[in-house]
């Protein structure tokens, strides 16, 4: 699915691409881009899996009716579509913030916090979406020819590359503590829709309460990031 290997260069010539001793700072921008790549990969994986599930349901009959016309299957497909569309929307928003970050402090701050939050949530949700979509195909989904097994095998990888769940959650906390403007940028963004739905307003309020006290927050970092992602 995604073959990996390790390469060792012996007696190779190398050039510094940044100040000596500042490797982490030099590479961090590359890491930001590859984290965005991971979000894109997960969103695409979710979308392909969802489309295959919908296509199958539109053509497969069971108990005398197409699967897509049966209420329980429609419910499952609706959940898949909503989650896939949300991942795609967030991915596009992050890509836009990345394009504008160099000349816009608000976008740069949003990108800093949202990239860590989205890397955690979207990449972690991809395997669950792939598994649910595979189930929609039944036994056919387990057959290699369906393409679903490959999606299922690939789906966990993006959550591991460029910082697994704990790393992404702790990076989000680091941004909140060291760059408080990232928190302001987050709330400015989500409050654009404030008032549209009381459930959204409650979710925003809950995140605000969670972030009001960042002392001893590390043990609940994953939960905080999950709440931010779901807003």
Task: Give the ranges of each region predicted by the language model.
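Internal glycine-rich alpha/beta core junctions
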Residues: 1-206
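C-terminal amphipathic alpha-helical interaction region
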Residues: 189-231
